[in-house]
């Protein structure tokens, strides 16, 4: 996972000041959070770089909805902005898992799914 420079990039994308905590200072375990809060939604990312874990919480205010994802095996987090679209991408070590894409501006959008859907995951009558 990316280290400290990614905290600044996430904070800039989320337009906030990150919270950094050392859960176990003797082990050097860091946990950092960023939060994006707008009139319609609140999004929080909690990152444990050493454990390669990311928790994503998305709260919509109108109508009220909550989506929470606990992600493991995260290889890197990439923040980008192109033509006014702010995006956070969460990549995984497993190449069969699609990158999670979270668009913050102009509209909050969360896109994630499997790149390859294994036939073994479906009953025989659904397989082609």
Model-derived regions: residue spans:
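Surface-exposed, interaction-prone regions used to assemble/regulate multi-protein complexes
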Residues: 1-128
């Amino acid at each position: 996972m990316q280290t400290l420079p990614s905290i600044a990039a996430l904070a800039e994308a989320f337009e906030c000041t990150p919270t950094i905590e050392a859960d176990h200072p003797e082990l050097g375990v860091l946990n950092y959070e960023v939060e994006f809060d707008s009139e319609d939604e609140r999004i929080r990312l909690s990152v444990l770089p050493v454990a390669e874990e990311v928790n994503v919480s998305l709260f919509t205010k109108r109508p009220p909805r909550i989506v929470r994802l606990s992600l493991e095996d995260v290889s890197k987090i990439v923040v980008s902005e192109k033509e006014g679209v702010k995006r956070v991408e969460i990549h995984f070590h497993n190449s069969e898992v699609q990158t999670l894409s979270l668009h913050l501006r102009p509209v909050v959008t969360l896109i994630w799914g499997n790149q390859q859907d294994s036939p073994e995951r479906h009953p025989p009558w659904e397989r082609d």
